């Protein structure tokens, strides 16, 4: 079974990852195939593993999580029909329920623009840019993010003191075996973290099997893409962090626990459903539905861990095409616009980077620029503590992990999972498609549900939105000529939502009295699409995270700041209060009431809220199911969702300040 799936996965991965840019450098079919390790022949557990669902423990560690029931039902509908348009919309707007990521992420990755047309900045280009750009760096090897990146690509970012001492050891003659040994060494660091840095540790047979799959997945990626990028420890960390949400062994629920979870026996694995058992138990039939997805499903998604890992890396490490190639395509398509392109380089960079994205060097510079503009006090404190001056492995490499590797290793798995949701759901609107096309793809989603998903996080004012523009002007007490603003084109390009007004018909299936009354009552509604490049959006998410930790950071010294940001704590995780028996009893009663009053994902609104006088008072679209253990505990609910929303506010604040400065 594993051999067949390996053959199928290698064929599909070679089909999906080929592109004109990359195939010229690497032809996946010419890469030597790696034999599956013997551990893969071990038969995975067939029955459901022991779960904490339904059991009550005074040491009940649960991540805070709540989710609108109507959006959940819509997500389930899209998942059952493999509707990647609908899943991408929900994923970028609200995030995916964490216990469904192992089925949703493969569907999103298969259709992701960065997977369909991949481009990863080759190491040679990085070295050329490294030698030519010496902006604000010292002459030491760790003086700039670029130099540190090259050393990390060669030696591994985590190669600190103990790693360099290991280098003099004799290396295997086989280059494949040499890479495998590096992967094993980086996997060992993860194990040491979770085994409390014990000098000697043992792993179970199940843990060994999972780690072997991760090792094999990283090795095969390097053999396929090794002519573009060399092995780097970040690849192993991406595999480890993916395994915290996607079970490496097919048809099992076992995932890595991550750093936020601790078990009495220091186990590396946990049941996928355990963390969210409170939420799962509050929705009838959801547990059986999830178990069917885990143990029986082969229709929705049967992508292997190796295939998902490869596609995830292509998304996280994606880089836009070099400027020279972009200019060649622009010459053929926009020759008239090139005459107007002789603008100041700084302004061109600021007005194009949010839409096109940039290299890691450009993103680091842009991050520092936005930090000074949006968080001046924190930026000044960082300057005093000499933060963001050196980017070597002992300095500010945390920023490289934040921006280039999208929070791999340094963020909590709960925060990182939600941010990866946002990035995997990123989709641009095809200008050749109209509203009716996408509305049909969304299966004519209810207008109220669409409004509940909200606008794109990084919405901005469109040039045709005169009312909003006038409101901005009045609030600032100024007027400006939009035609003279160098940000005019940027705003127009970013204003890409598909709107439908009461003057426009949707489709034959929507042209009825009920829908027409909806259109008459409200002038318009829209389908939100992504506006800002996801890696640029990640910069504002990172700034939002720093803003939320600002009060803590200003109390720390240089070393403490770097340690703190290299292992950023989460607020999405809350420990249950100790030994309160009445709290346990309250949870039992509230859980039973919620279970009887909630709707099944397949249920109807008429079954809602049987203990209330008027069921209309609590319709389906207002029910929020929570993962909290008891109602009187003060959980930090939706911390990362608030961070993402705040990042949109920071984006608009930056855009507005640039518009003012530009005048």
Swiss-Prot record:
Residues 7-23, 130-144, 589-611 have a biased composition (Low complexity). Its main location: cytoplasm. Residues 163-178 have a biased composition (Basic and acidic residues). InterPro entries: Rab-GAP-TBC_dom, Rab-GAP_TBC_sf. Residues 1-28, 126-178, 575-611 are annotated as: Disordered. SUPFAM superfamilies: Ypt/Rab-GAP domain of gyp1p. Keywords: Cytoplasm. One of its GO terms (cellular component) is cytoplasm. Residues 95-427 form the Rab-GAP TBC domain. This is Oxidant-induced cell-cycle arrest protein 5. It comes from Candida tropicalis (strain ATCC MYA-3404 / T1). The lineage of its organism: Eukaryota, Fungi, Dikarya, Ascomycota, Saccharomycotina. The gene is OCA5.
């Amino acid at each position: 079974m594993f051999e067949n799936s390996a053959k199928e996965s290698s064929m599909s991965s070679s089909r999906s990852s080929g592109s004109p840019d990359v195939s010229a450098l690497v032809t996946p079919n010419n890469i030597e195939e790696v034999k599956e390790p013997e551990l893969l022949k071990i038969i995975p557990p067939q029955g459901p593993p022991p779960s904490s669902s339904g059991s009550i423990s005074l040491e009940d560690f649960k991540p805070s999580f709540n989710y609108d029931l109507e959006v959940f039902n819509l997500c389930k509908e899209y998942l059952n029909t493999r509707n990647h348009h609908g899943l991408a919309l929900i994923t970028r707007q609200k995030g995916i329920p964490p216990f469904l990521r192992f089925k949703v992420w493969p569907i999103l990755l298969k259709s992701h623009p960065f997977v369909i047309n991949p481009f990863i900045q080759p190491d040679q280009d990085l070295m050329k840019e490294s030698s030519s750009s010496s902006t604000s760096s010292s002459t030491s090897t760790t003086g700039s993010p670029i130099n540190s990146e090259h050393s990390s690509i060669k030696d591994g970012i985590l190669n600190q003191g103990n790693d360099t001492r290991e280098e003099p050891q004799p290396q295997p003659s086989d280059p494949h075996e040499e890479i495998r040994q590096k992967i094993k060494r980086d996997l060992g660091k993860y194990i040491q973290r979770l085994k409390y840095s014990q000098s000697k540790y043992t792993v179970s047979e199940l843990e060994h099997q999972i780690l072997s799959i991760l090792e094999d997945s990283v090795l095969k990626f390097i053999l396929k893409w090794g002519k573009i990028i060399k092995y780097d420890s970040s690849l192993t960390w991406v595999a480890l962090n993916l395994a915290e949400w996607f079970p490496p062994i097919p048809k099992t629920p076992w995932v890595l626990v991550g750093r936020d979870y601790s078990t009495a026996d220091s186990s590396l694995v946990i049941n996928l459903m355990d963390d969210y058992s409170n939420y799962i138990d509050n929705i009838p039939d959801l547990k059986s539905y999830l178990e069917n997805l885990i143990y029986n499903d082969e229709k929705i998604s049967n992508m292997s861990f190796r295939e998902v890992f490869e596609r995830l890396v292509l998304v996280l490490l994606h880089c836009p095409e070099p400027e020279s190639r972009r200019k060649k395509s622009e010459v053929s398509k926009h020759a008239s616009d090139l005459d107007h392109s002789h603008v100041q380089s700084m302004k061109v960079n600021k007005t194009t980077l949010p839409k096109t994205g940039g290299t890691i060097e450009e993103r680091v510079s842009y991050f520092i620029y936005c930090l000074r503009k949006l968080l001046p006090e924190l930026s000044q404190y960082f300057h005093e503590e000499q933060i963001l001056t050196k980017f070597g492995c002992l300095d500010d490499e945390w920023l490289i992990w934040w921006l280039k590797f999208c929070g791999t290793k340094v963020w909590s798995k709960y925060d990182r999972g939600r941010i990866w949701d946002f990035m995997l759901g990123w989709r641009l609107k095809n200008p050749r498609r109209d509203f009716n096309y996408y509305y049909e793809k969304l299966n004519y989603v209810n207008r109220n549900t669409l409004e509940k998903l909200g606008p794109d996080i990084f919405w901005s004012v469109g040039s045709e939105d005169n009312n909003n523009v006038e409101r901005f002007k009045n609030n600032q007490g100024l007027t400006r000529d939009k035609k003279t603003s160098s940000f005019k084109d940027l705003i127009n390009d970013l204003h890409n939502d598909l709107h439908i007004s009461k003057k426009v018909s949707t489709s034959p299936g929507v042209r009825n009295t009920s829908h027409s009354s909806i259109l008459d009552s409200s002038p318009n509604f829209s389908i939100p699409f992504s506006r800002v490049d996801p890696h640029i959006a990640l910069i504002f998410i990172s700034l939002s995270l720093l803003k939320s930790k600002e009060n803590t950071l200003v109390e720390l010294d240089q070393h403490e700041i770097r340690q703190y940001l290299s292992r950023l704590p989460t607020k999405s995780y809350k420990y249950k209060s100790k030994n309160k028996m009445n709290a346990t009893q309250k949870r039992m009663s509230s859980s039973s009431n919620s279970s009887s009053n909630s709707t099944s994902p397949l249920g109807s609104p008429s079954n809602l809220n049987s203990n209330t006088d008027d069921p209309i008072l609590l319709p389906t679209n207002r029910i929020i199911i929570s993962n909290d253990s008891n109602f009187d505990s003060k959980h930090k609910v939706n911390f990362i969702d608030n961070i993402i929303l705040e990042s949109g506010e920071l984006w608009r604040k930056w855009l507005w300040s640039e518009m003012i400065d530009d005048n």
